[in-house]
């Protein structure tokens, strides 16, 4: 009612995921209210979730934006103790070129030693990261380990899966296309509905 973060509900959700053997938690992703949180709220959420999980399962932390310098600054200066990897969305609204997307992720890769999961969701960002750009990033930066693919373009996803480096995974970013994507060779999903039905 007062528009503050319901931290108690968040902890109940974390406990629910742990009780139902979720493989890992994605914290501060873009499906949540992350874009409307203050920096202090984000830091508190990160701290609370890391403490609650206490190393039981890996934590994938959302660190992205359309201001490359701000993302790099966050990666260089924030404390990432307890974070296993970061999820970083394609820059939104600005509609960068494919070379611009590449340079954005190059800067991110060089700013951290943490594993990086790319996130392509053109329906939200306004620009699609093409297969050739994804593959170029995957080949050039060893700490880029996967992509959360939510373009909805099965041909594009299949192209990535067929041509990716061995140490790079494709993860579905859309519950509705998870099964066909797994049949092509994707390794799983970062799920929305899994928040409500983690066991299923």
For the regions a protein language model found, what residue spans apply to each?
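Active-site beta->alpha loop and helix N-cap motifs at the rims of alpha/beta catalytic domains
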Residues: 1-126, 136
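Catalytic alpha/beta core domains of metabolic enzymes, predominantly
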Residues: 110-111, 124-200
């Amino acid at each position: 009612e007062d528009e503050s973060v319901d931290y108690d509900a968040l902890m109940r959700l974390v406990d629910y995921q742990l009780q139902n053997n979720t493989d890992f938690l994605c914290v501060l992703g873009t499906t949540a209210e992350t874009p409307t949180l203050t920096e202090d709220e984000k830091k508190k959420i990160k701290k609370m979730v890391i403490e609650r999980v206490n190393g039981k399962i890996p934590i994938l932390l959302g660190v992205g934006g359309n201001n490359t310098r701000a993302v790099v600054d966050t990666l260089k200066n924030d404390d990432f103790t307890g974070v296993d990897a970061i999820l970083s969305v394609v820059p939104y609204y600005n509609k960068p070129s494919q070379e611009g997307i590449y340079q954005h992720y190059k800067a991110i890769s060089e700013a951290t030693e943490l594993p990086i999961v790319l996130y392509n969701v053109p329906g939200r960002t306004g620009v699609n990261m093409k297969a050739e750009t994804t593959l170029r990033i995957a080949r050039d930066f060893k700490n880029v380990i996967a992509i959360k693919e939510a373009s909805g373009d099965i041909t594009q996803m299949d192209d990535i899966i067929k041509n990716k480096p061995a140490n790079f995974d494709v993860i579905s970013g859309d519950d509705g296309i998870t099964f066909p994507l797994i049949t092509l060779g994707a390794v799983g999903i970062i799920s929305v509905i899994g928040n409500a039905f983690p066991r299923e």
